[in-house]
Amino acid sequence: MINVSTSPRQTLDWTALKPADGSPAVEWRISDSPVPYPEAVATMEARAAAIAAGEATELVWLLEHPPLYTAGTSGHASDLLEERFPLFTTGRGGQLTYHGPGQRVAYVMLDLKRRRPDVRAYVAALEQWIIATLDAFNIRCERREDRVGVWVRRPDKGVGYEDKIAAIGVRLKRWVSLHGIAINVEPDLSHFKAIVPCGISDPRYGVTSLVDLGLPVVMTDVDIALRAAFENIFGETRAAAPAGI
């Protein structure tokens, strides 16, 4: 099992993540109702195990959670400032973050052994996926060497100010990826104030969303952009079956 934390890293080549020609398309599933966190993790882990065993195809699962906080493998209890919502300890890399309505979570279950067994290149590919997705809305986002996630410069707030618009936290088991990304579309940003998001306490670095930046988008718009950008980086997708994961 491999976890990816927020330790400093070099920007790595994210290309060559597409599978070999003739590989099955990645299933693309969207849940319309909020999914409880324990249920989502159990479902994701079962599917990842089936992928590793060659019994299921790869999957991207888009969903929202009810309001909650998660602590990754580098999380610290002191980063929870207020106990507003349930806190779940999880196996992904990273520290504390908030999930809730208005945030698009994408759980990505890919067989990196078939694609490219390079965990840091995979994280860079996830960053590029987010950057390409938000570029469809004319939002210029950037990655940072010392801060995992995707950031937007905020000169309106002051020199050197940046806000995180999307978070990344992954885990690999038998080279199958678990967890994934979270893009802030229209969440209640005040809930991030109850934690030290991703362990970053510097006041120059905050949190934003598409709507906070003045874009009148809805979740469906983001889902369409996510799928198009994903296919350019990771390969073809197909709609998942109506029932089951």
Swiss-Prot record:
Tagged with keyword Protease: no
Pathway: Protein modification; protein lipoylation via endogenous pathway; protein N(6)-(lipoyl)lysine from octanoyl-[acyl-carrier-protein]: step 1/2
Keyword field contains Acyltransferase: yes
GO cellular component, one term: cytoplasm
Annotated EC: 2.3.1.181
Protein name: Octanoyltransferase
Function: Catalyzes the transfer of endogenously produced octanoic acid from octanoyl-acyl-carrier-protein onto the lipoyl domains of lipoate-dependent enzymes. Lipoyl-ACP can also act as a substrate although octanoyl-ACP is likely to be the physiological substrate.
Biological source species: Rhodopseudomonas palustris (strain TIE-1)
